[in-house]
């Protein structure tokens, strides 16, 4: 079984939460293949998963909010980032759907926040 997790790259909380779920799955089903699709860094994911093997497909599924500083949001930059995401998402979804089909067998999609994950599952 392939587990494909679309994870928001906006902050480490999403990655930590998904890692906890997937680590619990791996403990019960160690032969399952774990794939993390996220813009989170490989270093962060390696730390979160430890010795549990996983694959990282570097995809950005959402923008969250672009920070102006530690406490503020840069609304214009967030809107620009969202427009760019909406422009490239159709190609990304098509490419990831094709990749998933090439893997053969069943796949379970998990999404932590990105609504576009539902389009990939369709």
Place the predicted regions along the sequence by residue.
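Short active-site oxyanion
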Residues: 29-35, 104-108
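Short N-terminal binding/cap micro-motifs at the start of the first secondary-structure element
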Residues: 12-16, 44-45
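Short beta-strand/turn micro-motifs composed of small residues
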Residues: 6-7, 36-40, 111
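Nucleotide-activated donor-dependent transferases that construct or modify glycoconjugates
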Residues: 1-11
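Conserved nucleotide-sugar phosphate-binding/catalytic loop shared by glycosyltransferases and other
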Residues: 32-89
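Short amphipathic alpha-helix
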Residues: 15-26
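Conserved nucleotide-sugar donor-interacting segment of glycosyltransferase catalytic cores
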Residues: 95-122
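N-terminal cationic-hydrophobic initiation segments that often serve targeting/anchoring roles
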Residues: 26-27, 46
């Amino acid at each position: 079984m392939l587990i494909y997790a679309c994870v928001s790259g906006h902050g480490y909380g999403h990655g930590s939460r998904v890692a906890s779920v997937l680590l619990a799955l791996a403990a019960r089903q160690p032969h399952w293949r774990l794939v993390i699709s996220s813009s989170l860094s490989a270093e962060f994911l390696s730390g979160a998963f430890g010795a549990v093997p996983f694959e990282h497909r570097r995809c950005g599924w959402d923008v969250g909010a672009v920070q102006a500083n530690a406490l503020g949001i840069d609304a214009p930059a967030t809107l620009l980032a969202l427009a760019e995401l909406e422009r490239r998402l159709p190609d990304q979804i098509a490419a990831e759907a094709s990749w998933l089909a090439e893997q053969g067998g069943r796949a379970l999609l998990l999404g932590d926040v990105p609504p576009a994950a539902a389009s990939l599952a369709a």
